[in-house]
Regions:
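NTP/phosphate- and nucleic-acid-binding module
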Residues: 1-382
């Protein structure tokens, strides 16, 4: 991802955190390492972390040598899921909430996976892929686990649709895994077909009991007056695929009001205001360049201090027409372009141009911060 893509994914992750840790619920953020501790048996599945020279030295003794067993046994295993690392924090989480259920743990991080055989250039080699994933592990009593699964399904589907231009492209389907455990998949309808962006599943207590063998008493949480081993509800999202979904969702071809040519359309990336990497572009129009840039710099500092992301177009040295700037900023999904001109020096008025409506309005420079803050906040609360 480049700068804009990285900012888009960061904004999506920030919105995920806001939804995963609602004020009324006991959900805590954790951060497990990328790889597990050494000691996994040689035959255990998983991607190993090895220095090439160490592996070469071990292989010189033959493929089944004790040296190779030692090397594989001391290698860390790259995580393919956030779940084991999150579940390892369950007992500590339980103490924080005085053993009261329900409660939850959440993490965002990179996970690794073997690429499908169809994507391998050599059938004898296995390539490794990575993805940025989100996980909410929700611990509830077995009695209410089904209700909580339905609750999180509604919440998550509503969340994905909230930021979409075409909400109906996000859908859900139910399934049962090989062990009969119930779950749901949330999909996005891409041009080439439907792909999963998030999976919800009631894991029961199996994973917890495997994580803490012989220590089931540590797992007991309070459900009213009863002590129970909770069921784990896993809400596992693919943020990289989510970014791709919103890029496809927001790309629109609109009529170009700046030209009379037939079949002339402008490309607009109409990302939701909360997801747009940049909220504002600052540019200068006619007037004394030095003074106008000083005004832009002051406004840039004020907006960024208030966490409004700004593109400093006024620093550009290659001249461009307003039409070219509008096209560029629409494709960058910038919500507003602010034009500072000699009129700003005279009376403090700037021109504000909207990405979504292409309408231009005049506004006093002192009102910009509050206007932009309210605009993004109101979009978030819809």
């Amino acid at each position: 991802l480049g700068p804009l893509g990285a900012a888009l994914r960061a904004n999506l992750a920030a919105q995920w955190w806001d939804s995963a840790i609602p004020p009324r619920e006991q959900v805590f953020a954790v951060d497990a390492p990328l790889h597990g501790p050494p000691g996994a048996p040689r035959e255990a599945r998983g991607l190993r972390l090895l220095h090439p020279e160490t592996l070469r030295d071990a292989l010189r003794g033959g493929g089944h040598s004790p040296a190779l067993d030692r090397v594989l046994g001391t290698a860390g295993v790259l995580r393919e899921s956030l779940l084991p690392g999150v579940l390892a924090q369950y007992v500590s989480c339980l103490e924080l909430v005085n053993k009261r259920l329900p409660c939850g743990l959440a993490q965002i991080g990179v996970c690794f996976h073997s690429l499908p055989e169809s994507e391998q250039p050599d059938e004898n080699l296995t390539r490794i892929g990575e993805r940025t994933t989100s996980l909410l592990a929700w611990f509830s009593s077995p009695r209410t686990a089904g209700q909580w699964l339905d609750y999180w399904l509604r919440q998550r589907l509503q969340w994905w649709r909230k930021f979409a231009v075409g909400p109906s492209n996000f859908s859900s389907s139910d399934f049962h895994d090989e062990e009969g455990r119930r779950g749901f998949k949330l999909h996005y309808k891409f041009p080439w077909g439907t792909e999963t962006v998030e999976t919800l599943k009631n894991l029961g207590d199996t994973e917890l009991l495997q994580m803490y063998p012989g220590e089931s008493s540590k797992l007991l949480g309070r459900d009213g007056r009863r002590n129970v081993i909770p069921h784990v509800l896993s809400v596992n999202g693919n943020l990289d695929r989510g970014v791709l979904a919103y890029l496809f969702d927001s790309l629109q071809l609109a009529e170009n009001p700046l030209t009379t040519k037939k079949n002339s359309q402008r490309k607009v990336l109409k990302l939701h205001p909360c997801l747009a990497p940049l909220k504002v572009a600052l540019d200068v129009g006619k007037g004394p360049t030095t003074e106008l840039r000083q005004v832009c710099q002051g406004l840039f500092n004020e907006l960024t201090e208030n966490r409004i992301s700004v593109w400093p177009g006024y620093l550009e040295t290659v001249p461009a027409s307003l039409e070219q700037l509008y096209t560029k900023y629409d494709e960058m999904s910038i919500l507003f372009m602010i034009l500072i001109t000699d009129a700003t020096l005279e009376n403090g008025v700037v021109q504000l141009r909207s990405r979504d409506t292409t309408m231009k309005e005049m506004m006093h420079i002192s009102r910009l911060k509050d206007f932009l803050t309210k605009y993004v906040t109101s979009a978030k609360n819809v």
